[in-house]
């Protein structure tokens, strides 16, 4: 087992390229380095500098390296799905390639608004929509690999069409293993009622990339009972440090050892919006905890 630990802007309360409730990017990078991390994701494109030379200089002076980043789109949309994803890839791809990153995560657009929680799309895809999702994901994976040397990992995510275990199983069955891998997010998986430990054991060959966080059981119960949307659930404190919550991280570590996992483990604890003094202590505690239990 070799887990390369990193973190992400998400763990500092960053969800958008620009928002007055988010801390300046310079402070984010400073605090990542202070907390002891060496690897990061770039976060929403435009939050960190998009000029490659500027970004490389800022990373280098803090001793930081980049594992990858993500794009968000609607691959099932017959009109805008591929064109939007291709634009996103053409913007982000050269930066990831220039920084030596290996992974591109695809996040399907939520069927609720990230800021308001209001419904914006159907909760379920029909058969044709699901096939478009699969086909567009394949196309994105092929293009990302051929043009930028990136491996595509599909981020199964709350309030998207691939969040519950049966939906993820169907997606895995429908996609080509040599093209499409899965980003297993322990928090999102548990949020949707799944067991990330068992899922890791079953599907480890398709999982080269992890997001590490936990879920507060009491908040999850309230969210489920009242059907509270994702954005509001995050603001309520749904996601917590790995040392707390419903996911048994010692058991998850054992699963990683048993399957001889080699890959990234990115600490990505959603906490938007977050007071500026909140993320750093959590980041330090989380890194210490993961090292203590033998992850990273």
Regions found by a protein language model. Name each.
Residues 41, 68, 105, 153, ...:
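Conserved beta-strand positions in the central sheet of alpha/beta enzyme cores
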Residues 11-13, 44-46, 72-75, 108-112, ...:
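Active-site-proximal loop/turn and secondary-structure-junction residues that shape catalytic pockets
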Residues 1-36, 60, 100, 138, ...:
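Histidine-acidic metal/acid-base catalytic patches
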Residues 49-56, 81-86, 276:
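Metal-dependent catalytic neighborhoods of phosphoester/phosphodiester hydrolases
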Residues 81-182:
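Active-site acidic/histidine proton-transfer and metal-coordination neighborhood
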Residues 1-17, 67-76, 112-120, 230:
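N-terminal small/glycine-rich loop or linker at the start of catalytic domains
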Residues 39-59:
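Glycine-rich, proline-tolerant flexible connector loops at the mouths of alpha/beta enzymes
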Residues 10-24, 76-86, 122-130, 240-243:
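Active-site mouth loops of central-metabolism enzymes
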